[in-house]
Regions:
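Hydrophobic, well-ordered beta-alpha structural blocks that scaffold small-molecule cofactor pockets
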Residues: 1-2, 8-22, 182-250, 256-262, ...
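Cytosolic Rossmann-like ligand/nucleotide-binding regulatory domains
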Residues: 2, 6, 29, 45-48, ...
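Cytosolic ligand/metal-binding cores
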Residues: 10-11, 15-136, 245, 251-363
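Short flexible coil/turn linkers enriched for glycine and charged/polar residues
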Residues: 74-75, 88, 115, 125, ...
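Glycine-rich beta-alpha junction loops
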Residues: 100-101, 125, 149-150, 160-162, ...
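Rossmann-like NAD(P)H-binding beta-loop-alpha module
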Residues: 130-151, 172-174
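Short, flexible, solvent-exposed loop/turn segments with mixed acidic/basic and small polar residues
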Residues: 141-147, 194-198, 367
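Conserved small/polar residues in nucleotide/adenosyl-binding loops
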Residues: 364-371
């Protein structure tokens, strides 16, 4: 299958790396030749140094024969334009990264499809949903769904209470166990486990299973005593914070700490009345204690500064908060943040790339089935 990715930024680059392992015909387009040259020599893909909104550039990339065209440039308008051009020049299906939630409303779907934009990806919304999934099951660090939710991949950290510590994997129940351990992260090392490998204290273990057996995995990993989240404190009134408040269950009480008074005023207009908006510096521990940090089960740091978010989560952990979530947009910081035991790390660019990857794999399988 021929796939053209427009934009060699963080989303496009991560997506190209994922898809290059799938042995597809991948073409990455960007105007920045330096970005492309770094990728061209390291991954199984082709690059085209041209603007994705240029008709001549799209022709050079062979868009007429593309099965899938994906616009993931930073600018929403360019992604939409590139997808419209690609469809009219012969691309079978298009996906555009957007920043406007209004475009996702069902009443607009047919309109955009007629224009040539078949699917829309809104990273802030995807990140918000991941955050809510993380705090609803506070003992899980990462959660991904596949095959329409029929299969899940979860990551959780091993503490002293885990029943499966120091047991060779081949002794965990053989073929009858309702899960498969697909990876173990030990420090900065990722292990693809074999039967004689053992799970050690502080490992992050990744399981594939079905939702039916999540309680069983919770039991064997010693997480049954983790408290349910009732109180959530969010540091930073970003767009992701707004979307997060819209997806949290009704039984959760949410507070947003925001330093900018103008943004606080705006937040009062766009979030539900049940959400408390507090004007103050989220780095001020005295303020956080006054606002009930010790009675908070989940602390979510969503400022535009990765370092601030990491440090704030570390501080919240030390104050006894069970679940912390940090937005880390600097990709170079992600592995460091994970090693600091701050809980769940969110990067909206990587989430968007992973979501598009899952869409692409599903579309690839569908196309293969249609051609049989």
């Amino acid at each position: 299958m021929k796939i053209i990715i427009a934009g060699a930024g963080a989303v496009g680059t991560h997506l190209a790396k994922l898809l290059s392992d799938e042995k597809q015909d991948i073409i990455l387009m960007d105007e920045n030749e330096e970005k492309l040259s770094k990728l061209d020599s390291n991954f199984d893909l082709m690059t085209v140094n041209a603007s994705p909104t240029s008709i001549s550039g799209l022709k050079n990339a062979g868009v007429a024969g593309a099965d899938l065209f994906i616009g993931v440039m930073p600018e929403e308008s360019r992604n939409m334009t590139a997808c419209m051009l690609a469809t009219n020049m012969g691309a079978k299906k298009t996906v555009a990264r957007i920043d406007n939630y209004e475009y996702l409303l069902p009443k607009h779907k047919e309109f955009f499809s007629q224009l040539g934009v078949h699917s829309l990806i809104y990273p802030e919304m995807l990140a918000a949903k991941d955050i809510v999934d993380a705090i609803k099951m506070s003992w899980i660090r990462q959660w991904w769904e596949f095959c329409g939710g029929a299969l899940v991949l979860i990551g959780t950290k091993m503490r002293e209470t885990a029943e499966i510590l120091n047991v060779p994997l081949h002794e965990l129940g053989g073929r009858n166990i309702p899960f498969h351990i697909v990876a173990i992260k030990r420090g900065n090392e990722t292990i693809i486990p074999r039967g004689d490998d053992v799970i050690k204290l502080h490992d992050i273990v990744y399981f594939t299973t079905t939702k039916k057996y999540i309680p069983y995995i919770r039991k064997i990993t010693g997480k049954e005593n983790y408290p349910d989240v009732r109180n959530v404190m969010i540091m930073g009134g970003s767009r992701i914070a707004v979307r997060t408040t819209q997806y949290v269950p009704d039984y959760m009480q949410v507070k947003i700490i925001e330093n900018d008074i103008n943004r606080c005023n705006r937040l009062t207009e766009v979030v539900d009345d049940k959400v408390m908006i507090i004007n103050g510096d989220g780095r001020d521990m005295d303020l956080l204690m006054e606002e009930g940090l010790k009675n908070t089960e989940a602390f979510v740091a969503l400022t535009d500064n990765s370092e601030t978010n990491i440090l704030a989560c570390l501080a919240a952990k030390r104050m006894g908060v069970t679940k912390t979530v940090a937005e880390v947009e600097n990709i170079d910081y992600i592995s460091m943040a994970e090693s600091l035991d701050i809980g769940t790390v969110i990067n909206k660019k990587m989430i968007a790339a992973s979501h598009i990857y899952q869409m692409t794999v599903s579309y690839t399988h569908l196309r293969a089935h249609e051609t049989r």
